[in-house]
């Protein structure tokens, strides 16, 4: 099984287990319950439906047709689009001379916001986006490249017009090295300007690593975060190649572990060496969280272990 410092770090489980581990089932059930309680509470409050009734409706699939939604109070009316004009009129919304209503599309709204930005003051708040898995190196696209994001943060740090920075994080994590590169630049930035992290749907593992130096961290009730933990994967293909394709390997080598790779199982010493690196990253991670959030390391360890939270 892959080396891991955390029993809740479940990303490796599909490769080594036929079903969820007890620890993963525990954390996933609590996450699901937390998310459902938040959603159900909001619906219950907004629509005046008590939680017991809402859970019964959900369990028995009592709302599957528009008429069901109307009956149970999930919607107020069932109308065609053209009938909405009557609703607008009842609400006192003014139409033009042709009886039509002027709608603003999202694109038009964005253009207006851009036009308004021309009148901004000399002092600015920079918004930097960190969206996607965290990977090493430089680049652009659907991932967060460690060196590229660090350079962006360095740029806003050097910009005298920027008085504060908001980092919008929406990431499941990724490379520990890239996360540390970003973390370092966040530390340098924080020393000079206020830094606020705004978490999106998730800011877990490396996503939390890069967030923890911020002066303030803001999350949504449904944000999945935490997962403070580390794992290492080392693929061994020797059995699959031998049993499926009849391919075998032999080698000569200069040193004991010179042949360490996918075509040979790890020796106890090799596994211990990898685990040493995993443990080092985990210790660094938990210490940085303790430092950034001003918490005792023991408190961080209580909520770490790779466990996700909402």
What are the language-model segments listed below?
Residues 77, 85-91:
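Terminal amphipathic helices with adjacent charged low-complexity linkers/tails
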Residues 1-51, 55-59, 63, 89-194, ...:
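Small-residue-centered hinge/linker elements
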Residues 75-81, 218-219:
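Short acidic-hydrophobic, aromatic-tinged amphipathic segments that line or gate anion-handling sites
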Residues 50-72, 76-77, 292-310:
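Amphipathic alpha-helical substructures
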């Amino acid at each position: 099984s892959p080396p891991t410092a955390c029993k809740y770090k479940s990303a490796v489980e599909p490769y080594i287990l036929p079903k969820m581990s007890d620890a993963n089932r525990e954390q996933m059930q609590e996450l699901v319950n937390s998310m459902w309680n938040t959603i159900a509470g909001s619906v219950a409050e907004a629509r005046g439906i008590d939680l017991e009734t809402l859970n019964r409706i959900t369990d028995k699939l009592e709302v599957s047709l528009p008429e069901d939604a109307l009956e149970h109070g999930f919607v107020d009316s069932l109308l065609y689009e053209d009938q909405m004009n009557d609703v607008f009129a009842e609400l006192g919304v003014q139409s033009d001379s042709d009886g039509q209503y002027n709608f603003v599309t999202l694109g038009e709204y964005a253009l207006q916001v851009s036009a308004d930005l021309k009148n901004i003051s000399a002092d600015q708040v920079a918004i930097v986006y960190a969206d996607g898995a965290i990977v090493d190196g430089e680049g652009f696209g659907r991932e967060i490249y460690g060196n590229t994001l660090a350079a962006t943060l360095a740029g806003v740090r050097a910009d005298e017009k920027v008085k504060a920075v908001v980092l919008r994080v929406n990431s499941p994590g990724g490379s520990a090295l890239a996360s540390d590169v970003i973390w370092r630049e966040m530390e340098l930035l924080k020393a000079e300007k206020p830094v606020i992290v705004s978490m999106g749907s998730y800011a877990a593992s490396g996503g939390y690593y890069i967030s923890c130096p911020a002066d303030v961290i803001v999350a949504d009730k449904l944000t999945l975060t935490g997962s403070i933990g580390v794992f290492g994967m080392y693929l061994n293909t020797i059995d699959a190649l031998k049993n499926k394709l009849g391919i075998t390997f032999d080698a000569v080598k200069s040193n004991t572990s010179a042949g360490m790779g996918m075509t040979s199982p790890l020796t106890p010493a090799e596994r211990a060496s990898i685990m040493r690196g995993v443990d080092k990253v985990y210790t660094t991670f938990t210490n940085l969280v303790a430092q950034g959030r001003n918490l005792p390391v023991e408190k961080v360890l209580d909520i770490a272990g790779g466990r996700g939270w909402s």
